[in-house]
Each structure stands twice: as C-alpha cells, then as structure tokens.
C-alpha cells in the first residue's frame, strides 16, 4: 500500500469513527431526554390512589411513590412474571403478563386490587373506559342523561367506548338515578381516559384517571 492510499484509508477510518461516536452521543442524548425504552414483551403497571393521603406503591423493585390522593402515577415497565405488590401498608401477590397493562388500586377501607387495562391502539379516536370497582351496575351518560356513552357496566368489570376527540360533560348513573356529575374531561386522539368508580352503596366515588402530564 503506497503512502497516499494509506493516508486515504486512515482518513476514511477516522471519519467513520467520528461519525460513530457522534451517533452514539446522539443516541445517549436521546436516551437521557426520553428515558429508557421498554424491552419487547414487558408488562406495564401504574397506581391509582382512591384514598385521601399520599401513597407509596412498589412491585418487586419497581417503585411508584408519592401518588397523590385521587391521583395516579404514570406506567412503569418491568419484566412479566409473579411479584408481591406493596400498596401502602398492604401487600398482594400479582401476576403480570407480557405486553399487558395494569393499574394497582388502593381503596379506603378495602383491599388493594390489580386491574387489567386492555391496550388501545386507535390513534384517530379517544377511548373512554369505565372501571367499575363498586357493587352496582352503572352507566356513563351525557350530563343531561339523554345519551348513553358506556352502558351497563357490571360490578367489578369495565366497559369501553371509542369516541371522537372532544371536551365533554358526562355523568354517572345507576339505572335512572344520577349518581354524580363528573368534571369536564378533554379527550385527545390516541388517549385512554378511565373513570374509576370505587366505594359502595350510596357512597360511590367516580374519578377520572389520565396519564400525568409531564413538565418540559
């Protein structure tokens, strides 16, 4: 190899190395910005606190701390499998399946529950979900009671409805009886908004649960 060819070869190698380092640095910066991506087949879990004081939750070594009253954490990913979940002062065994989403719910005076959250993949519409953890059959309607949105959701079950993005005023009904008017909620494309209903008898507590908005 003559000196000129050797020089060109080293120049190309140096350029390739510098580009590789730059690409690695860009990926590192992107990782720092967006956080680690979930490995394929992960399970996802969040916490909803139906109580009146802050709540700490853990699943295995994954922590969901300082969950505000009537608030929720964001989802965190972890390997699928069997774990012990610690919800405040109570614990329960949980089994998390691959590519599945769950909410750990803490209820005042009751045992914590693991609630499955079927994933939603329609990016053009929003999904309204009623997670009914009460003992009554419930219906989500427009605030005037004239139109059913999610009808006849049985105790300890959920009901879904895909709708166009909109800001709406809704109410929860037990048969023809209005249980509660709900806070106005804005539904965005590709978003799942859950109405969690806890409590029993005449003391039902419906609360909208959305993924927290992250600050820039």
Curated annotation (Swiss-Prot):
An annotated GO cellular component: periplasmic space
Protein's GO biological process: alginic acid acetylation; alginic acid biosynthetic process
Intracellular or extracellular location(s): Periplasm
Record flagged with keyword Signal: yes
Pathway in which this enzyme or protein is active: Glycan biosynthesis; alginate biosynthesis
Transmembrane segments: none
Signal peptide: 1-28
The entry's keywords: Alginate biosynthesis, Periplasm, Signal
Pfam families in alphabetical order: AlgF
Family listed: Belongs to the AlgF family.
Function: Together with AlgI and AlgJ, forms an inner membrane complex which probably interacts with the alginate polymerization-transport complex and adds acetyl groups at the O-2 and O-3 positions of mannuronate residues. Acetylation of alginate is important for the architecture of biofilms and increases resistance to opsonic killing in the host.
Name listed for the protein in its UniProt record: Alginate biosynthesis protein AlgF
The species this protein was found in: Pseudomonas aeruginosa (strain ATCC 15692 / DSM 22644 / CIP 104116 / JCM 14847 / LMG 12228 / 1C / PRS 101 / PAO1)
Classification of source organism: Bacteria, Pseudomonadati, Pseudomonadota, Gammaproteobacteria, Pseudomonadales
Gene symbol of the encoding locus: algF
């Amino acid at each position: 190899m003559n000196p000129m060819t050797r020089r060109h070869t080293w120049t190309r190698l140096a350029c390739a190395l510098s580009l590789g380092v730059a690409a690695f640095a860009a990926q590192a910066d992107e990782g720092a910005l967006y956080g680690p991506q979930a490995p394929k087949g992960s399970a996802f879990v969040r916490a909803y606190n139906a109580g009146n004081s802050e709540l700490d939750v853990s699943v295995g070594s994954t922590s969901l701390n300082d969950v505000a009253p009537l608030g929720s954490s964001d989802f965190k990913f972890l390997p699928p499998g069997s774990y012990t979940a610690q919800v405040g002062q109570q614990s329960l065994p949980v089994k998390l399946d691959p590519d599945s989403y769950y909410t750990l719910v803490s209820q005042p005076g009751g045992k914590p529950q693991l609630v499955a959250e079927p994933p939603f993949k329609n990016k053009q519409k929003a999904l309204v979900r009623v997670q009914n953890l009460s003992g009554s059959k419930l219906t989500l309607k427009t605030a005037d009671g004239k139109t059913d949105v999610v009808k006849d959701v049985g105790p300890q079950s959920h009901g879904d409805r895909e709708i166009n993005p909109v800001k709406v005023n809704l109410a929860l009904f037990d048969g023809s009886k209005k249980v509660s008017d709900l806070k106005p909620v804005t539904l965005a494309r590709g978003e799942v908004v859950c109405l969690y209903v806890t409590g029993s008898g005449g003391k039902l507590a419906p609360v909208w649960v959305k993924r927290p908005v992250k600050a820039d």
